[in-house]
Amino acid sequence: MSLYMLVSTFAVAFIITVIGVPLFIPFLVKLKFGQSIRDEGPKMHEKKSGTPTMGAVVFITAMLISFLVFSFISGEVSAATWLLFIALALFGALGFLDDYIKVVQKRNLGLTSKQKFLGQVVISILFYLVYHFNDFAETLNIPFTNIEVDLGWFFVIFILFWLVGFSNAVNLTDGLDGLVSGLSVIAFSAFGVIAFYQEQMDVAIFCFAIVGGMLGFLLFNKNPAKIFMGDTGSLALGGSIAAISILVHQEWLLLLIGIIFVIETASVILQVFYFKATGGKRIFRMTPIHHHFELGGWSEWRVVLTFWGIGLVGAIISVCVVIF
């Protein structure tokens, strides 16, 4: 029965997305909701300008429908269900607002960094309050040990850092056709297996709803992309994967399962720090680091496949660590 629910959750999210995206693309084109390309970005990306964006509206809708329907059918509705709903829906809503400002008001940078950060903090605090008042463990496991560290009220700082950090990390990574879509299929599959192994069916249902939606979206988002997810999708996925790692109590494994997200973010931080420290010198040709490889002569598809491969290795190792 449990496996049937997971397969059904996956299938419904996949089917809704596969049907919905082709119907949504002409609607976005009619509204002229096209992606703007940064002037400072790689020149080979200029041809992507005008590609419909905000496609995440379809797959987030598909995921939420599938997740909530099968959660209620299976009787697996819990506090974790609503925590995951908060992460996906509210981070998605913040991203939607950012995208709307970019494509409708023609402000290429969208929300200011302060506005976006404030929104992320508010959502993270709401997540923490629901988490705290439902008596979830506010501890962190020391990797490869059975030692638990009780953080007490400092746990709220960790929640803020984790949710804000990973929502931004996935957002930074979303710069190549299919990159985040494929990495999300891999990462959420890994957490789905871990949640199933831990018998946390509510979390497992959520994971496989996302895998179904993302696999369906990948069919249209792979190179050459017919549609982009926008910040609507990247913020929602980043907030969700951070929330899942907390609920399955495998926070540190997210650094391995989401290793590409970590590397992309680290490359930006290092580049900025080195640039300021040396008065204008750079470590990489351009960051996030996927652009470094593009400017080094790699095709976009080669970068994406390589990064998927690294993400897959990290995910497999993580699942093995938990199960074996």
UniProtKB/Swiss-Prot annotation:
Sample GO molecular function, one term: phospho-N-acetylmuramoyl-pentapeptide-transferase activity
GO cellular component, one term: plasma membrane
Keyword Cell membrane tagged: yes
Pfam families from the UniProt entry: Glycos_transf_4 (PF00953)
E.C. no: 2.7.8.13
UniProt function note: Catalyzes the initial step of the lipid cycle reactions in the biosynthesis of the cell wall peptidoglycan: transfers peptidoglycan precursor phospho-MurNAc-pentapeptide from UDP-MurNAc-pentapeptide onto the lipid carrier undecaprenyl phosphate, yielding undecaprenyl-pyrophosphoryl-MurNAc-pentapeptide, known as lipid I.
Protein name: Phospho-N-acetylmuramoyl-pentapeptide-transferase
UniProt source species: Listeria monocytogenes serovar 1/2a (strain ATCC BAA-679 / EGD-e)
